[in-house]
Structure formats: structure tokens, C-alpha cells
UniProtKB/Swiss-Prot annotation, chain B:
This is Ras-related protein Rab-10. Changing T73D: Phosphomimetic mutant. Reduces interaction with GDI1. Interacts with MYO5A; mediates the transport to the plasma membrane of SLC2A4/GLUT4 storage vesicles. Interacts with GDI1 and with GDI2; negatively regulates RAB10 association with membranes and activation. Interacts (GDP-bound form) with LLGL1; the interaction is direct and promotes RAB10 association with membranes and activation through competition with the Rab inhibitor GDI1. Interacts with EXOC4; probably associates with the exocyst. The modification Phosphothreonine is found at T73. It comes from Homo sapiens. Regulated by guanine nucleotide exchange factors (GEFs) DENND4C and RABIF which promote the exchange of bound GDP for free GTP. Regulated by GTPase activating proteins (GAPs) including TBC1D21 which increase the GTP hydrolysis activity. Inhibited by GDP dissociation inhibitors GDI1 and GDI2 which prevent Rab-GDP dissociation. One of its GO terms (cellular component) is focal adhesion. GO terms for biological process: antigen processing and presentation; axonogenesis; cellular response to insulin stimulus; endoplasmic reticulum tubular network organization; endosomal transport; establishment of neuroblast polarity; establishment of protein localization to endoplasmic reticulum membrane; establishment of protein localization to membrane. Its cofactor is Mg(2+). The keyword Endoplasmic reticulum applies. GO terms for molecular function: cadherin binding involved in cell-cell adhesion; G protein activity; GDP binding; GTP binding; myosin V binding. It is found in: Cytoplasmic vesicle membrane; Golgi apparatus membrane; Golgi apparatus, trans-Golgi network membrane; Endosome membrane. The small GTPases Rab are key regulators of intracellular membrane trafficking, from the formation of transport vesicles to their fusion with membranes. Rabs cycle between an inactive GDP-bound form and an active GTP-bound form that is able to recruit to membranes different set of downstream effectors directly responsible for vesicle formation, movement, tethering and fusion. That Rab is mainly involved in the biosynthetic transport of proteins from the Golgi to the plasma membrane. Regulates, for instance, SLC2A4/GLUT4 glucose transporter-enriched vesicles delivery to the plasma membrane. Switch 1, switch 2 and the interswitch regions are characteristic of Rab GTPases and mediate the interactions with Rab downstream effectors. The switch regions undergo conformational changes upon nucleotide binding which drives interaction with specific sets of effector proteins, with most effectors only binding to GTP-bound Rab. The lineage of its organism: Eukaryota, Metazoa, Chordata, Craniata, Vertebrata.
Length: 205, 200
């Protein structure tokens, strides 16, 4: 983007200075046009030297050198153009990466099995599997206890357990809670159950 | 508990890929209802349903597992106490069928050796979207020597039949005991160890 205006300026300068101006230029800013200008100037001066065979000999070599210079200048300007495009692309790439980088933070340094947690996200993961396991276990335990209590309530409501046995039944329930650690209450329970439900099992079998 | 409201307690387990309809199958069986909204099960849940088979009141405690991979460490710890496992796939989801072998391997690794298994191809009401032919389900079931049903929780097809058949199969293996000698405990349902009760 900076080069074309520069070149134009140089060309203008060159025009002002005539073909000889090309000889005063920096070799890194030389264009094919400049080489042609130089050829013109040298050709003119060689002609002025007359038709000495040595001049002719020299002329062939000078033409050859100028052709080489032309090739190098063309090649150079092409390379400059390529490098300039390459630089612009890389600049854009860096720009993009910088933008991503500021969003993702230090993610780049994480291993393949790592995850970034957004601490401002109210829905971010924050409990461990063990905690979930415990909560689920407690939920399911309470749920099954609720079912037991509901069934028991149903028994009272339907009059299966006479009201006068209520207190006894309640005491029995208290024992049931600790049943796992109290084997003796098991037997007691069974007999009460048998008493209360004997007519039921009789009906079933 | 004053609970001789049942003679036997069977513990069943539902497994299979996420979204195949395990919870819906269970909900249809336990509450005879169906809900179209998909709510992913968190970890593990259960429902209770008492059925009567051969003159015996059998309480079924049916554990419903989350199909999502992230819950697997939780759900696999519930395989051990199961007496029957229902492996569910979705006939409109080829991947869920392909994964059957993976689920069967899970059963082999984590469940009791004598667990009663059953394969269910759910959503059979959606025949227009079917990608798994019934024959393929029957074939894989035959290869593994397990029962197979195509079910629909939505249209209530084969749901009760599947559960009752599984319960019957377990009942057949259950040694006959004096009914009231059973002391089953459902209050410890949350823990695997709670199931070492003498229910089988």
C-alpha cells in the first residue's frame, strides 16, 4: 500500500531528471523501467565512441549485463510483492488469534482432558459426583420411607389398625427405624404384623 | 413395619441409552400415564408397583437409571442388587441399538450373575421412523438367550406384559418359602447393601 505512491514519486523524479536519473537511484528501488533508461543512456554513449570493434565487443557484454540486471530487478519486485502479501496475511492471522486469545484466556496451555469453567456462569458445574451420589441416595431413601409411611397411613385410615392399638403401633414404628441394628425388634415386629394382617394373608393364599 | 402388604420384593433396573424412553416406560407401568416432554433423569430414581402373580403379592421396586454417560459411575453401582434388568433401545435410533452390546457388557461386569435380563425395543408406535427392524431385535435377544418385546410407552403397547413377564421369570427362580418368613426392607432402597434382605 505504501509502495505504489512511492514508485510514482520516483518515476516523477526520474522523469524530471531524465534517463540519467535512474543511475542515481538506490539499487533496492530500481525498476525495469530504470534499467531500460540506463540501457538507453549507455547505448547512446557507446554509439558516440564510434565503431571500434573493441567497443562492439564491450557493447555485447554490457547488453548481457543489463539483461541480467533486468531479470534480477523483475524477480526482486515479484518477491517483494509476495512478501508483502504474506506479511498482510500473517498480520490478519495474529489479529484474529489475539482476539480469540483474549476471549479464551489461558485455554491454550490446557491438556486435552481439561476444561475451562466460566466462574461467572450461574449454571457452571460445581458439585462432585460423590456429592450427587450422596444426595440421590438420601432422596431415594426418603422416598422409600415416604412410601412406607403412606402405606401405613392407609392402613390406619382404612381401619385395619384399631384406634386403641394406635400408641402400640406407633411405638413399634419407632423400633422399626432402628431395625437394621436391632435384631430382636424384628421378631416382635413380625408377630405384630402377623397379628394385624393374618386375615389378609389368609385371604391371599 | 406393619407391612405384610406384599409377599415378595423384586428389584428391577432399567438401563439403555439416553432418550430411549426408560423413564416413560416406567411411568406408563407405575402410573399408567405418558408425558411427551423429555426430562433427562438425574443419576438414579425409582418407583414402586405392587403386582399379583400366582397368588402372591409382589412388590416391584424399579430403578430408573440415567442413560447419559456422565452418570455411569453412579448408575453402575446399582446393578449389583438388581434381580431383573430391562435393557431398552429406541427402534427409531440406530445408535441406541448398536449400543446394546455395550450395555450387555456392563451387565456382565456389574450385575449379579443370575440376573434376569430382558430386551425392549421402545417407541414401536413410530413405525414411520423405524430404523431397527423387529427381526434384528429378536435376533440379538436370541443370541443372548434373553426375552424381547417391542414396546410403546406412548401407545401403551406391551409395557405391562414386559414387566409381568420379567417378574414371573424371577418368581420362577425364587425358592418357595413360607410367605411370612420374608423380611424385606424397602426403606434402605438407596443403598446397594440394603438389598441383601432375604427376598430371594
Amino acid at each position: 500500500m505504501e509502495e505504489p505512491p512511492l514508485r510514482e514519486e520516483e518515476e516523477e523524479e526520474g522523469d524530471e531528471a531524465g534517463p540519467e536519473g535512474a543511475l542515481g537511484k538506490s539499487p533496492f528501488q530500481l525498476t525495469a523501467e530504470d534499467v531500460y533508461d540506463i540501457s538507453y543512456v549507455m547505448g547512446r554513449e557507446l554509439m558516440a565512441l564510434g565503431s571500434d570493434p573493441r567497443v562492439t565487443q564491450l557493447q555485447f557484454k554490457i547488453v548481457r549485463v543489463l539483461e541480467m540486471l533486468e531479470t534480477l530487478v523483475n524477480e526482486g519486485s515479484l518477491t517483494v510483492e509476495e512478501l508483502r502479501m504474506e506479511r498482510d496475511n500473517l498480520r490478519k492471522e495474529v489479529e484474529g488469534l489475539r482476539r480469540e486469545g483474549s476471549a479464551a484466556g489461558r485455554e491454550v496451555n490446557l491438556g486435552p482432558d481439561k476444561m475451562v469453567v466460566d466462574l461467572t456462569d450461574p449454571n457452571r458445574p460445581r458439585f462432585t459426583l460423590q456429592e450427587l451420589r450422596d444426595v440421590l441416595q438420601e432422596r431415594n431413601k426418603l422416598k422409600s420411607q415416604l412410601l412406607v409411611v403412606q402405606e401405613e397411613l392407609q392402613c390406619y385410615k382404612s381401619g385395619l389398625i384399631p384406634a386403641r392399638e394406635g400408641p402400640g403401633g406407633r411405638r413399634e414404628k419407632g423400633a422399626l427405624v432402628t431395625r437394621a441394628s436391632n435384631a430382636s425388634s424384628n421378631k416382635e415386629e413380625k408377630t405384630i404384623i402377623r397379628k394385624l394382617f393374618s386375615f389378609r394373608s389368609g385371604k391371599q393364599t | 413395619m406393619a407391612k405384610k402388604t406384599y409377599d415378595l420384593l423384586f428389584k428391577l433396573l432399567l438401563i439403555g441409552d439416553s432418550g430411549v424412553g426408560k423413564t416413560c416406560v416406567l411411568f406408563r407401568f407405575s402410573d399408567d400415564a405418558f408425558n411427551t416432554t423429555f426430562i433427562s433423569t438425574i443419576g438414579i430414581d425409582f418407583k414402586i408397583k405392587t403386582v399379583e402373580l400366582q397368588g402372591k403379592k409382589i412388590k416391584l421396586q424399579i430403578w430408573d437409571t440415567a442413560g447419559q454417560e456422565r452418570f455411569h459411575t453412579i448408575t453402575t453401582s446399582y446393578y449389583r442388587g438388581a434381580m431383573g434388568i430391562m435393557l431398552v433401545y429406541d427402534i427409531t435410533n440406530g445408535k441406541s441399538f448398536e449400543n446394546i452390546s455395550k450395555w450387555l457388557r456392563n451387565i456382565d461386569e456389574h450385575a449379579n450373575e443370575d440376573v434376569e435380563r430382558m430386551l425392549l425395543g421402545n417407541k414401536c408406535d413410530m413405525d414411520d421412523k423405524r430404523v431397527v427392524p423387529k427381526g434384528k431385535g429378536e435376533q440379538i435377544a436370541r443370541e443372548h438367550g434373553i426375552r424381547f418385546f417391542e414396546t410403546s410407552a406412548k401407545a401403551n403397547i406391551n409395557i405391562e406384559k414386559a414387566f409381568l413377564t420379567l417378574a414371573e421369570d424371577i418368581l420362577r427362580k425364587t425358592p418357595v418359602k413360607e410367605p411370612n418368613s420374608e423380611n424385606v426392607d424397602i426403606s434402605s432402597g438407596g443403598g446397594v447393601t440394603g438389598w441383601k434382605s432375604k427376598c430371594c
